[in-house]
Regions:
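Conserved donor-binding loops in enzymes that form glycosidic bonds
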Residues: 134-135, 165-170, 198, 221-222
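Donor nucleotide-sugar binding/catalytic pocket of nucleotide-sugar-dependent glycosyltransferases
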Residues: 85-149, 219-221
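Short N-terminal targeting/anchoring amphipathic segment
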Residues: 9, 24-45, 54-64
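Nucleotide-activated donor-binding/catalytic signature segment of Leloir-type glycosyltransferases, i.e.
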Residues: 186-190, 197, 203-226
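Conserved donor-binding/catalytic core segment of Leloir-type glycosyltransferases
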Residues: 151, 157-173, 179-183, 194
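A short, basic/aromatic alpha-helical/loop segment that forms part
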Residues: 140, 168-175, 188, 202
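A conserved catalytic-core segment of Leloir-type glycosyltransferases
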Residues: 1-27
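Acceptor-binding helix/loop patch of EC 2.4 sugar-transfer enzymes
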Residues: 2-8, 31, 59-93, 139
């Protein structure tokens, strides 16, 4: 659903709800939950959440709001509020409101997102909307890290400073802008740039990197967490 084209993604989100509910009944029918945790995308799991809450009346439902959809699709020009695309927007906007209503708490990625959700959804109790950033505190450690070994492992220059960009590579991340930034630094010899990630726009970035043949840029599809 998250790494497909726009049409397939939209159709997939519509049918995903039915598939999830069917799987929940089949494999977790006798399991009881204390917390029902789910994230966006997708926003089309309202019936699944309702069913899970009916089976687990004392469970708390918590929405991790990573994407504010469909508004982000409007911002990217993929949908419009009016016209034919507006029909699609209104369908998903209704789904979004339903998902908010069934959630006991809504965790947003930033204070700005909290403010946006509260302002554009006045029917929601503002007290249930809070910050739940998609990150964690990095613990200080005395463990010795073999930085030289890491650079050799990934064929990175030993003496140069390395700048790293990592994460999802989809439409919202503005990969064309990232490419423009890389164009501006591709001939630098005093530093090195590492790009790591995956998503619907990865191929576009990979094609450019291969064509640029820059010694200052390294692109990785995936790296181990440790």
């Amino acid at each position: 659903v998250t790494k497909t084209n726009v049409v397939e993604k939209g159709v997939g989100q519509v049918f995903l709800e039915y598939q999830f509910k069917k799987a929940l009944k089949k494999y977790f029918g006798t399991v009881r939950f204390d917390v029902i945790l789910y994230s966006t995308p997708p926003i089309t799991l309202t019936r699944v959440i309702k069913y899970a809450k009916q089976c687990n009346p004392s469970a708390m439902s918590y929405l991790l709001l990573k994407d504010i959809f469909p508004q982000n699709a409007v911002d990217l020009g993929m949908l419009t509020i009016r016209g034919l695309k507006g029909v699609v927007y209104k369908f998903f906007r209704r789904k979004e409101k339903e998902l908010y209503r069934v959630s006991d708490f809504i965790g947003c990625m930033s204070p700005a997102n909290v403010k946006y959700v509260r302002e554009h959804n006045p029917a929601i109790n503002p007290g249930i909307v809070e910050i739940a950033p998609n990150s964690f505190e990095v613990l200080s450690t005395r463990e010795k890290i073999d930085w030289l070994g890491i650079r050799k492992k990934y064929n990175l220059p030993i003496e140069k400073p390395v700048f790293i960009y990592g994460g999802n590579m989809g439409k919202p991340q503005g990969i064309p802008f990232l490419i423009e930034c890389l164009k501006a630094v591709k001939d630098r010899e005093d530093c090195h740039f590492v790009v790591v990630g995956n998503g619907t726009e990865y191929l576009k970035l990979e094609t450019w990197v291969n064509g640029a043949n820059s010694k200052a840029i390294s692109l990785f599809h995936h790296l181990e967490r440790e």
